[in-house]
Each structure stands twice: as C-alpha cells, then as structure tokens.
Amino acid sequence: MLSVIILAAGKGTRMHSSLPKTLHTICGEPMLFYILETAFSISDDVHLILHHQQERIKEAVLKRFKGVIFHTQIVEKYSGTGGAIMQEDKTPIPTKHERVLILNADMPLITKDALTPLLESKNNAIGLLHLADPKGYGRVVLENHQVKKIVEEKDANDEEKEIKSVNAGVYGFERKFLERYLPKLHDQNAQKEYYLTDLIALGINENETIDAIFLEEEYFLGVNSQTERAKAEEIMLERLRKNAMDLGVVMQLPDSIYLEKGVSFKGECVLEQGVRLIGNCLIENACIKAYSVIEESQIVNSSVGPFAHARPKSVICNSHVGNFVETKNAKLQGAKAGHLSYLGDCEIGKNTNVGAGVITCNYDGKKKHQTIIGENVFIGSDSQLVAPINIGSNVLIGSGTTITKDIPSGSLSLSRAPQTNIENGYFKFFKKP
C-alpha cells in the first residue's frame, strides 16, 4: 500500500473567482472530488494539504468523503509545492505507509489506470509528459531513463529547449527519501518558494535513482484558468458520453449533449440533440427529445420533450411529457401532458390527460402547496389548479376552468363566465366617427 498527499493550498488567482479553484465543477462535480475518488481507489491513507479558504473546502469534502486527513500548509514560512508537505521543523507530514504518492488537486482527469506506470515504479519517481510544444514548461533532462536534471525554460540552453519531456506534477517517493532531503530544501529562488523539483535535484546530486515515468497527457491536464477548466470538462464529457454509449444509449449528435457524473442509464435509452442531464438522474427505457433539460429526476419508460424541463424531484413513469412542459417535484404515473404546462408539487395518476396551458398554482406567496390528481382525469386546456387541491378519479374539467376546491371522483367541473355574443358588435366597435 501507499499513502497519497494531495496539494490543494493554492489561491487559484487565474480563475478570477471567489470560489476556491478546487471546488469549481467539472460535469457537475467539484474537481477536487475526482482526485479524491482516485486517491481512495489506491490508498487507505489520503492527506489533503489546504490553506486558502481551507474551511470552505474542508466543509465541502466532509459532506462527501470520510477518512481524509487534513493539513494546513504553513505558507508564511514554507510556501510552494515542497513547503506543502513540510511540518514546522521541515520534516515531512506523517504518513501511514513508506511509499508516498504526491498529486495536485487541480488535475480532475487523473484515473487509477493512468497512474499505474508510476505506481509500479519501485524507486523514487517523477511523472513526465511528452509534449509536442513544451514552450513555457521546465524541461526534464534524461539519461538512461533516469532523471539527470530539471531545468526551467528561462535557464535552458538551445539544446535543452528542444527537449519535449516536461514535469507532469506527480511524484512517487519513499518516505526515507523525504526525511533525508526535505530538511535540506531551501527557498533561494526568484519566487522564494520551496519546490518539489528542487527536492529531486538534491537527490540527483547525491546519486539517488529517480525514475522517469512517462504518462498520458490527457489525464494530467492541470486546471488553472476557466479556459483550462472548459477543456477538462470537454474531455470528461467525452468519457461520460462514451461510457453511456458503451451501455447502449443512443445519442444523436453526441457533441451537443451535456451530462453529469451522477447520471445513470438502464435499458434502452435515446438522447436527441441538445439534451442536458444535470445532477443525479436516472434514465431508464426512455427517450429524451431534443433540447430538453432533466435535473435531479427519474424518467422511466417515458418520453420527454422536445424542449421540456424536468426540474428536481420529478419522477416521470410510463408517461409522456411534451414540448414546453415544465415539471418540478412532480410524480406522473401513466399520465400525459402534451404541451405548454407547468406541473409543480403534484401527483398525477394513470390515464390522466393534462391539456395545453394547464397550470398547478402551487405557490401562494409564502408557501408551496400540493396538487393531487387521481386516475382517468381529463383536464381541459388553459385550466388553473389552485393548490392545495385534491382532484378525484374519473373527473372531467372543462377548458378554462379555475379550480379552487376539491373535486369528488366522477364529477364534471366547470367555472367560467357565460359567453355573450353581441349582434353587429364588430361593426359598432369599429364604426368610424
């Protein structure tokens, strides 16, 4: 086994946001959560180094993960990546295991499989990337698959600038290596920071073996700006779409479909173009038609859309919800709402038909109220159901009716002003003076 240390103390200034960088989301999940999941998949000893807005980050983590060991970086005294793993006396933070893997919290695309080459190394090791264009990165000079030195671009000569090997920002160390060299680390550089790369340089000077482990670039993209966050999200979306299609989900124009990590599919499902699936959703044997939005809801044996919006806590089973219908905290069981309706805080029974323009008036300005609709109910177009209201089964509601009282089963309900036709009214109205 090994211990994992995740570095998450930075300010994330380039994100230009009051939200801590590591809590910015990738497909609905804070990017820090991805790296924590990966860490717990390989270790029972996970450490998180914090400083900037640490209480906010800690609160978010504790809602989701158990067993994370939190540390506060002493940035006033020991800043930088090397300082992140130092205690007050410059010794490494205590870990359960002798092997220590160090990761950055802003790399949400890392997976267990992507780390395998680094995990298999028995020596102290640094993860490397081979970049076609390494401009802006420090170069890693190799000799017989071992790290000879790490040189910053501004200090590199012309030959070194041609090197394509750069630091991926992930490391595997033996604890005794950290104990030996961390106290020797210094901050005599332009940034006045302690760097893990300098730690490696100290080891090389003492003829320590440092393995160079090449990793796949896609998995080790660091997120330091909104542009990089968007790039990482697109890569994650590609993974989620592929996983869904591998399960048999039919996607029309996959690149136009957005889905989040909490979405699950069962049975035969179709997603038309422009669909957005947000939060923890279950889509089972269902067709989600073009440009519909499903949030924190369950769609089972049903068709939804096009241009429909199922807001949180909607459960739509054996039903049809058509274009421009919005549901919220609604339970539909075998019902139809073809178009242009708002169905909020309601339960609708089987074989019930909701006409165009029907609205459940669920909010009285202070509280939300529920509408209960039974089975075999026909609700005429442009009707308003003023909650709280209970409509029995086998009920017919005439078009344009405003319901303010419960309706017993078997009833016909009407409430409308009598129609008046005025003979020659048109001509009288438009008569010229």
Curated annotation (Swiss-Prot):
Residues 227-247 are annotated as: Linker. This is Bifunctional protein GlmU. PROSITE patterns: HEXAPEP_TRANSFERASES. It comes from Helicobacter pylori (strain P12). Its cofactor is Mg(2+). Residues 248-433 are annotated as: N-acetyltransferase. Its EC number is 2.7.7.23, 2.3.1.157. Residues 1-226 are annotated as: Pyrophosphorylase. Mg(2+) binds at residues 106, 224. It is an enzyme of class 2 (transferase). It is found in: Cytoplasm.
